[in-house]
């Protein structure tokens, strides 16, 4: 007999070699119906896994991220099996679970059409109904290669040949379908009650543009049809809010073929951008930050010294100046470090907070580019803080409070993750432990719940990630706090302590928006282009019913401009109904409609985007209303 410790601390005794599924049934038949996987001693496992020693056991359901991935990973195999049944000539590439769904890449001589997707989806439904048992088996390298060669699957051969010697090579079988896969998977295909194929796109094999273009079928899966219906409804709403569409319609930005991944901000987009940057400066000045600016191009040696060369060079751009190799910076931290090193520092200056709205460039594959959300050049709202070890907790708490104060202004809820040491990290175990505990202590001191994201820290230190939740339930990773003992060591940073001796400072890297461009994209979608008054590129649109009101309208426009209001005058010879509809499409917060009555009474008829017709009021009263919204950064309900 062995002892199994459950997540709630309860210990149960079971027979050695018992399957997880049998333990779940023993715990609760209701839980058995919901269970999709497990964690054994912190490692992801399947319900079919046998436990042979005392272990800690956590049962995973679809409510858990790892549980959803298991369901969707199995769904990708169901997709591949359906395609192979219908189109046996298709060659299989890869098919992982991804955020909110799954995909599978196929090599086939024709393009999948919407009608074909419907046919594939029906075949997938048959496979689910067949409730095929899913079995895992392992093979030695040579036998594994023979299996996939005999099946005429060249991409699988390449994957196996690239595995390190001694690596476990596993396959999963459901009915007559076999696929190379590390898992995990469900016990059978019948557990999945709702699958939907969403789209087809091109994808280069292994993401390399030099390789063959494959066809990628995207889909999603749920255990309940009602959950799938809600998700599809959210996707429709997301299309309506797509920042790429709205960015063009509202004349905010474009991305041109002359510069893929390099956004062009138009005048109205620059208004939004400048407001955000000035807001950032205002908040940071009050919080004790000093702003700096560092060069975009720095020599190659600097990136070797910082460690970015070893960990990041595939994402960097390079150039040559006077026969010397230079790199376009992918991050701002080395420049900030050089500012710190420009003279000697005392502990009395700590914590030293250096902020920078720094332009960085990172090479992204063309297939990964997506409007403002995934670009090749962007502005990071970085700050680097230098401090003593004793100041870690208090300073991280200050940063957490600062980030929280930013997100509250926009009405965002958020959740927090603590990302720990990755495999390709640098530095000692002791430094990583101190850094990780420092972040944990600060999070607990702030009273924030957080999730551990194992192995997803930066190469130089652990980090706290802030994930914003938008009005349709999607999440976006924005703010980050990273604790770093490595850069100060690599650059030999020092300060003079109370004892008069030189000591090594601790460094914090942190962002609030993350990327100005991406944050603007998030705001466009969150507000569906209807920015709150303080952020709107045009706050007021003035329009006349006939030409006889033009002189009065010009006076109103000039008065508003003098008071700092962003106003446009629509003096076109069009019907007033047409002008109103145009302003509504441009999502202007307020319209002023002027007729003879308003001129004679020296008033303005105001129409609000949110509240509708507000009637005729004095310009002074209207400006007071505007200023209240602007000064207090009022945010309307964005739904």
Swiss-Prot record:
InterPro entries, alphabetized: aa-tRNA-synt_IIb (IPR002314), aa-tRNA-synth_II (IPR006195), aa-tRNA-synth_II/BPL/LPL (IPR045864), Anticodon-bd (IPR004154), Anticodon-bd_dom_sf (IPR036621), Beta-grasp_dom_sf (IPR012675), TGS (IPR004095), TGS-like (IPR012676)
Subcellular location(s) of the protein: Cytoplasm
Any GO CC annotation of this UniProt entry: cytoplasm
Gene3D superfamilies assigned: 3.10.20.30, 3.30.54.20, Anticodon-binding domain (3.40.50.800), Bira Bifunctional Protein, Domain 2 (3.30.930.10), Threonyl-trna Synthetase, Chain A, domain 2 (3.30.980.10)
GO molecular function annotation: ATP binding; catalytic activity, acting on a protein; metal ion binding; threonine-tRNA ligase activity; transferase activity; tRNA binding
UniProt entry keywords in alphabetical sequence: Aminoacyl-tRNA synthetase, ATP-binding, Cytoplasm, Ligase, Metal-binding, Nucleotide-binding, Protein biosynthesis, RNA-binding, tRNA-binding, Zinc
GO-annotated biological processes: threonyl-tRNA aminoacylation
EC numbers, comma separated: 6.1.1.3
Entry keyword annotation includes Cytoplasm: yes
Residue ranges occupied by any TGS domain in the UniProt entry: 1-61
Comment on bound cofactor: Binds 1 zinc ion per subunit.
Region (Catalytic) location: 242-532
Chief location bin: cytoplasm
SUPFAM superfamilies, alphabetized: Class II aaRS ABD-related (SSF52954), Class II aaRS and biotin synthetases (SSF55681), TGS-like (SSF81271), ThrRS/AlaRS common domain (SSF55186)
Catalysed reaction, written as an equation: tRNA(Thr) + L-threonine + ATP = L-threonyl-tRNA(Thr) + AMP + diphosphate + H(+)
Cofactor: Zn(2+)
UniProt keyword annotation of Transmembrane helix present: no
Binding annotation for Zn(2+): 333, 384, 509
Protein function: Catalyzes the attachment of threonine to tRNA(Thr) in a two-step reaction: L-threonine is first activated by ATP to form Thr-AMP and then transferred to the acceptor end of tRNA(Thr). Also edits incorrectly charged L-seryl-tRNA(Thr).
Protein name per its UniProtKB record: Threonine--tRNA ligase
Biological source species: Clostridium tetani (strain Massachusetts / E88)
Gene: thrS
């Amino acid at each position: 007999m062995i002892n199994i410790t459950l997540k709630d601390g309860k210990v149960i005794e079971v027979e050695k070699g018992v399957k997880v599924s049998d333990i779940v049934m023993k715990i609760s038949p209701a839980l058995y119906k919901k269970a999709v996987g497990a964690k054994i001693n912190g490692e992801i496992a399947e319900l079919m896994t046998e436990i042979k020693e005392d272990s800690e056991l956590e049962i995973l359901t679809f409510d858990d991220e790892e549980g959803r991935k298991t369901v969707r990973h199995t769904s990708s195999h169901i997709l591949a099996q359906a395609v192979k049944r219908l189109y046996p000539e298709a060659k299989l590439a890869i098919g992982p679970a991804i955020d909110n769904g799954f995909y599978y890449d196929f090599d086939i001589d024709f393009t999948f059409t919407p009608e074909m997707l419907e046919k594939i989806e029906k075949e997938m439904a048959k496979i689910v109904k067949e409730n095929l048992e899913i079995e895992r088996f392992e093979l030695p390298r040579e036998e594994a290669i023979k299996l996939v060669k005999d099946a005429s699957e060249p991409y699988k051969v390449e994957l196996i040949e690239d595995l390190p010697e001694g690596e476990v090579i596993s396959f999963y079988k459901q009915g007559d379908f076999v696929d190379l896969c590390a898992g995990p998977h469900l016990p059978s295909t019948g557990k999945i009650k709702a699958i939907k194929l969403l789209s087809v796109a091109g994808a280069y094999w292994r993401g390399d543009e030099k390789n063959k273009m494959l066809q990628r079928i995207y889909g999603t899966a749920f255990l309940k049809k009602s959950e799938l219906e809600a998700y599809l409804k959210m996707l429709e709403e997301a299309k309506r809010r797509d920042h790429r569409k709205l960015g063009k319609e509202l004349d905010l930005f474009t991305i041109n073929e002359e510069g893929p991944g390099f956004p062009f901000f138009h005048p109205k987009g620059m208004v939004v951008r400048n407001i955000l940057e000035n807001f950032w400066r205002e908040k940071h000045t009050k919080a004790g930050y000093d702003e700096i600016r560092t060069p975009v191009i720095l020599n190659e040696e600097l990136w070797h010294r910082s460690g970015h060369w070893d960990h990041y060079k595939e994402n960097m751009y390079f150039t040559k100046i006077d026969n010397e190799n230079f790199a376009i910076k992918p991050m701002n931290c080395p420049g900030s470090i050089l500012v710190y090193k420009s003279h000697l520092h005392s502990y009395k200056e700590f914590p030293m907070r250096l902020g920078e709205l720094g332009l960085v460039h990172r090479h992204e594959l063309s297939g990964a580019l997506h409007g403002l959300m995934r670009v090749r050049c962007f502005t990071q709202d970085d700050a680097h803080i230098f401090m003593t070890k004793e100041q870690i907790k208090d300073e991280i708490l200050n940063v957490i409070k600062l980030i929280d104060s930013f997100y509250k202004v926009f009405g965002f809820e958020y959740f927090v993750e603590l990302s720990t040491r990755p495999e390709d990290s640098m530095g000692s175990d002791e430094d990583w432990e101190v850094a990780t505990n420092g972040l944990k202590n600060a999070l607990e001191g702030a009273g924030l719940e957080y999730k551990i994201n194992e192995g997803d820290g930066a190469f130089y230190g652990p980090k706290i990630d802030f994930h914003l939740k938008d009005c349709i339930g999607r999440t976006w990773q924005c703010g980050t706090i990273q604790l770093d003992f490595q850069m100060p060591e690599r650059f030999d940073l020092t300060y003079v302590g109370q004892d008069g001796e030189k000591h090594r400072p601790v460094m914090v890297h942190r962002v609030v928006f993350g990327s100005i461009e991406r944050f603007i994209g998030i705001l466009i979608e969150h507000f569906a282009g209807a920015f709150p008054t303080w952020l709107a590129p045009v706050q007021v649109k003035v329009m006349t019913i006939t030409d006889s009101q033009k002189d009065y309208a010009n006076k109103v426009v000039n008065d508003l401009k003098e008071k700092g209001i962003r106003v446009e005058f629509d003096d076109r010879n069009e019907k007033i109904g047409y002008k109103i509809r145009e302003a509504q499409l441009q999502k202007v917060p307020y319209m002023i409609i002027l007729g003879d009555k308003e001129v004679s009474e020296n008033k303005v008829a105001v129409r609000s985007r949110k509240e509708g017709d507000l009637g005729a009021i004095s310009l002074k009263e209207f400006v007071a209303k505007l200023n209240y919204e602007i000064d207090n950064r009022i945010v309307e309900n964005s739904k």
